[in-house]
Regions:
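Active-site-adjacent helix/loop patches that line small-molecule binding or acyl-intermediate pockets
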Residues: 1-3, 69-176, 199-202
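Beta-lactamase-like hydrolase cores
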Residues: 1-42
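Short, contiguous, pocket-lining structural segments
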Residues: 17, 46-47, 128-132, 153-160, ...
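Short active-site loop at a secondary-structure junction
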Residues: 18-21, 36-54, 69-72
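Contiguous, well-ordered alpha-helical segments that form the cores/surfaces of helical PPI scaffolds
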Residues: 23-26, 53-61, 138-142, 197-201
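A short glycine/serine-rich beta->alpha loop
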Residues: 38-46, 74-78, 121-130, 181-187
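Active-site SXXK
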Residues: 47-64, 83
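Active-site-proximal alpha-helical segments within enzyme catalytic domains
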Residues: 187-212
Length: 212
């Protein structure tokens, strides 16, 4: 049986512990060997947006042309600030698409300031404002490049999603334990914390010019 979560931090006020935060952590070496482990680091979890780095690697393998800030938008969540939204539009424009192609649910920006500005301007929630729209736009651009269907690009059986699952397994060194539906409607893939750490170690030590 895996070790349960452990106390990682305490909130102390005037010498009295008023709160404890439990969790699990793992640190791996460049070769993926475990250096430090606390709590349960072997049971699968849904890393949610932490998987985006691996999925973006899969998109690069398929030919996604975005680089620099447009690759960053594919590899992480964004706050919905104007420059983020403009970047998502650039990804879509380059593929001959507009934001109507996005299947992200309508949302407000994560940025409170950006949300307040939109509310004052009388704007509404929109799919492009959702924090995962960069990844979705990059998937759509890859579909266009590969001449693949757009309407069902979020389906786990879609060729791009199948490849992204393979990228997660290859980079993490572990088979996906379960597939769910993330808040953006795209597949979310379960791996262990150790596998997630190994994936980031692989990315951080990758050769320049490699997909990672």
């Amino acid at each position: 049986m895996a070790e349960p979560s452990v106390v990682l931090a305490e909130v102390v006020r005037s010498g009295f512990v008023e709160g404890r935060h439990r969790g699990s952590l793992v640190v791996v070496d460049v070769d993926g060997s475990v250096l430090v482990a606390r709590g349960d680091v072997t049971s699968p979890v849904f890393p949610r947006s932490s998987n985006k780095l691996m999925q973006a690697t899969g998109l690069v393998e398929l030919g996604y042309p975005g680089r620099d800030e447009l690759l960053a938008l594919a590899a992480a969540s964004h706050d919905g600030e104007p420059h983020h939204v403009a970047g998502v539009r650039r990804i879509l424009d380059a593929a001959g698409l507009d934001e109507q192609a996005l299947r992200t649910p309508p949302d407000w920006p994560l940025s409170t300031a950006a949300r307040d500005d939109l509310v004052r301007a009388g704007e509404s929630m929109a799919p492009i404002l959702m924090n995962c729209s960069g990844k979705h736009a990059a998937i759509l651009a890859t579909c266009v490049l590969r001449d693949l269907p757009l309407d069902d690009y979020r389906a786990p059986s879609h060729p791009v999603q199948v490849h992204l699952r393979g990228a997660v397994e290859r980079m993490s060194g572990e088979p996906v334990a379960a597939t769910g539906v993330d808040g953006c409607g795209a597949p979310v893939l379960a791996i262990s914390l150790t596998a997630l750490a190994r994936a980031y170690s692989r990315a951080g030590t990758a050769d320049v010019g490699s997909p990672e």
